């Protein structure tokens, strides 16, 4: 397993966060519980939105797609992690590692872009309510979502293709929970300057520009809310944005904990922060968006009531 270029038959060893059998058992049950909560929560959000005509609006259209992305995101990483925690064989093939990396990178970018589009939706709803129906037409919503998908797919392809040019030497042991770009680049023995340059350039375009757009949108939203004379209307306007603002803060906060640092300082200690954006954020999003949302409460109640009646 030493030296030379990777071939299709070569493997990495995903050792995870701990090599202690006792700790691995604890981690297994913890991640299994979090995975099941994430799957159930996001599936319920998708089903509730699809089954309730009152939720067939741009905001919930994007929320359903965000839930689908989060569902896909955790399914890309956690099942393999659970298998590794219960197995002595912790190997992942080179092709499997790159596949996991591709979906990881693409889906993080997609999550980011959808959150930016949702910020625009909230801006139009609060700042231009009279033009909301025309400004957020079904055609525009589909166009915006399609653009998010195209950009995220291209972003993932660029970095995955560049990773195939990297040579790995020495130990193939990855003290991490999945195949993560920074971890793989730290293991490289070839020149990764082009990877690093492209990572910064594309990262600024895919992450910093949407993040800046989100910040500007919320500055304008808060200004508009403060101008509303009625206290009850202020509260209603803010409550429609609070859940999205919470999701944005959680997503970017955890992402910054991992990636807002030089590549050479990246270490296995960052795996804890990675768990936050890779596992905790997708798990928390359904709770954040439904906690104080009466429309979502009603839709979920009707959905569960219908299914319980069918069972009885």
Swiss-Prot record:
Disulfide bonds join 97-189. The keyword Hydrolase does not apply. Glycans are attached at residues 5, 195. GO terms for molecular function: G protein-coupled receptor activity; olfactory receptor activity. It is a multi-pass membrane protein. Residues 1-25, 80-100, 159-196, 260-271 are extracellular. It is found in: Cell membrane. Keywords: Cell membrane, Disulfide bond, G-protein coupled receptor, Glycoprotein, Membrane, Olfaction, Receptor, Sensory transduction, Transducer, Transmembrane, Transmembrane helix. Its main location: membrane. It comes from the Eukaryota. Residues 50-57, 121-139, 220-236, 292-312 are cytoplasmic. The chain crosses the membrane at residues 26-49, 58-79, 101-120, 140-158, 197-219, 237-259, 272-291. GO terms for biological process: detection of chemical stimulus involved in sensory perception of smell. GO terms for cellular component: plasma membrane. Belongs to the G-protein coupled receptor 1 family. Odorant receptor. This is Olfactory receptor 1D2. It comes from Gorilla gorilla gorilla (Western lowland gorilla).
């Amino acid at each position: 397993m030493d030296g030379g270029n990777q071939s299709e038959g070569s493997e990495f060893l995903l050792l995870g966060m701990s090599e202690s059998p006792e700790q691995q058992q604890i981690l297994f049950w913890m991640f299994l519980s979090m995975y099941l909560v994430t799957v159930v929560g996001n599936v319920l959000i998708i089903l509730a939105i699809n089954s309730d005509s009152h939720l067939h609006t741009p905001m919930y259209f994007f929320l359903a797609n965000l839930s689908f992305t989060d569902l896909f995101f955790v399914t890309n990483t956690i099942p393999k992690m659970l298998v590794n925690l219960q197995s002595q064989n912790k190997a992942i093939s080179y092709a499997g590692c790159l596949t996991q990396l591709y979906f990881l990178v693409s889906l993080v970018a997609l999550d980011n872009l959808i959150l930016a589009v949702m910020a625009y939706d909230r801006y139009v709803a609060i700042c231009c309510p009279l033009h909301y129906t025309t400004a957020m037409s079904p055609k525009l919503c589909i166009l915006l979502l399609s653009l998010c998908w195209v950009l995220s797919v291209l972003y993932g392809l660029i970095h995955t293709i560049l990773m195939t040019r990297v040579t790995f030497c020495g130990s193939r042991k990855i003290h991490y929970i999945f195949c993560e770009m920074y971890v793989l680049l730290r293991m490289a023995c070839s020149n990764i300057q082009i990877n690093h340059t492209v990572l910064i350039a594309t990262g600024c375009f895919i992450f910093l520009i949407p993040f800046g757009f989100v910040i500007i949108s919320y500055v304008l939203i808060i200004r508009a809310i403060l101008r509303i004379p009625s206290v009850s209307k202020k509260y209603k306007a803010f409550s429609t944005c609070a859940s999205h603002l919470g999701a944005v803060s959680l997503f970017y906060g955890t992402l910054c904990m991992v990636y807002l640092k030089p590549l050479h300082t990246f270490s296995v200690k960052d795996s804890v922060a990675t768990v936050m954006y890779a596992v905790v954020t997708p798990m928390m999003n359904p709770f954040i968006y439904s906690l104080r949302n009466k429309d979502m409460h009603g839709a979920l109640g009707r959905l569960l009531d219908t299914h319980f009646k069918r069972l009885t």
